[in-house]
Amino acid sequence: MEAIISFAGIGINYKKLQSKLQHDFGRLLKALTVTARALPGQPKHIAIRQETAFTLQGEYIYFPILLRKQFEMFNMVYTTRPVSLRALPCVETEFPLFNYQQEMVDKIHKKLLSPYGRFYLHLNTGLGKTRIAISIIQKLLYPTLVIVPTKAIQIQWIDELTLLLPHLRVAAYNNAACKKKDMTSKEYDVIVGIINTLRKKPEQFFEPFGLVVLDEAHELHSPENYKIFWKIQLSRILGLSATPLDRPDGMDKIIIHHLGQPQRTVSPTTTFSGYVREIEYQGHPDFVSPVCINEKVSAIATIDKLLQDPSRIQLVVNEAKRLYSLHTAEPHKWGTDEPYGIIIFVEFRKLLEIFYQALSKEFKDVQIVVPEVALLCGGVSNTALSQAHSASIILLTYGYGRRGISFKHMTSIIMATPRRNNMEQILGRITRQGSDEKKVRIVVDIKDTLSPLSSQVYDRHRIYKKKGYPIFKCSASYQQPYSSNEVLIWDPYNESCLACTTTPPSPSK
């Protein structure tokens, strides 16, 4: 049977393949279809989403090149589109890697040496996925396209590439660069582009790239972003993710058909001591009742209502003041000789401005940065991102901050709104590889006791226990937005410990 190999994948005549497989044809298509799992509380009128690892173009049906072995039984005769790749300049440049990073580099390099090589790297947040990928770029010496989800991550990639591989010509591809039509791998060695821009490009744009790196690859499951896979099939592809199969609806499984099963590396021995300060907050009756849409509780609308409580906003401000005081007045007590930073997470963008205004009134001379200038001007400014690397307080949404944002001086988190998903990535913002291990990590978690969302705290407990962080409980209310003394409710060193204490763990613990 004849087939073609192109940037869209393996193309086979639809009718001939259907005739050849007969009843197995339907089974094949079903096996390559991912159907979203219905989530608790999901309205029945919302259609269940499906995504397929095949696409139809005219008389042909295209499959990911990764699946070509499944067609070997048909003695396929492939017509391959020729691709000519130039080699990048070979300059001996060394930069340090941890042992686990070097082992993974060797493994990835071996896999990507083969034509149409694929590798899906699963490495926890903060452990150096970017540095591993840059080492692969240096070894393969192919013109490379790096696809990232946000401008913040794009800037981090540019900075890291420029630092580690200064001999290469590196450029950022964004909406402004789109006007420069000749900006391709002929002019640059490595191009770092944002998915929202690149997914609109024709397949000819991707032709000169011998290697494509997909940062946060698990996020490419969305209907629009997923289309990128049908334009890069001829390239070697390296996917990077800290949470490759973590979506509640299971839609990120579609990525496996293109990249293969995620491959984990041996976890490093670096540990960060820390603890959780869980505040049971009793909100004002006017703000704690659930908001229902189509007879189902809406988490987003309920959170929006919770944050209309001025006392709850003040509680967050008070906790920020408490942490800042600990960090600056008595830094030696917390395992450091200098102040360090606080990240305040909220659920959605409009809350960033609310908390920024509230914090600004209390912190007159403290640098507070909100990198997501997108809430005002449609994009993140380079200035805001640069300021964030020295700021004492950073405000982020969960959706923006859970991605590969790196601020190594940040060691405390305040979760200003409830959260259930992506907690591994959220905590990863204060446990970056290469940051100071001596500094105690502190997580402030507010549990709204009268809200239907209060049960989400138990999902967070699971992650805290996995990290080995003891949990200290205290209380506050709309009448008294200052938290009470702490009570130890879980101790990683004594599972049954329910002793009362007001003393946080020491750095040595």
UniProtKB/Swiss-Prot annotation:
Catalytic activity, reaction form: ATP + H2O = ADP + phosphate + H(+)
Domain of life of the organism encoding this protein: Viruses
EC number(s) stated in the UniProt entry for this protein: 3.6.4.13
Entry keywords, A to Z: ATP-binding, Helicase, Hydrolase, Late protein, Nucleotide-binding
Motif DEAH box: where in chain: 215-218
Positions annotated to bind ATP: 123-130
Coiled coil: none
Induction of its expression: Expressed in the late phase of the viral replicative cycle.
One GO MF term: DNA binding
Domain (Helicase ATP-binding) ranges: 110-262
Enzyme class: hydrolase
Family statement drawn from the similarity comment of this UniProt entry: Belongs to the DEAD box helicase family. DEAH subfamily.
Protein name per UniProt: Putative ATP-dependent RNA helicase QP509L
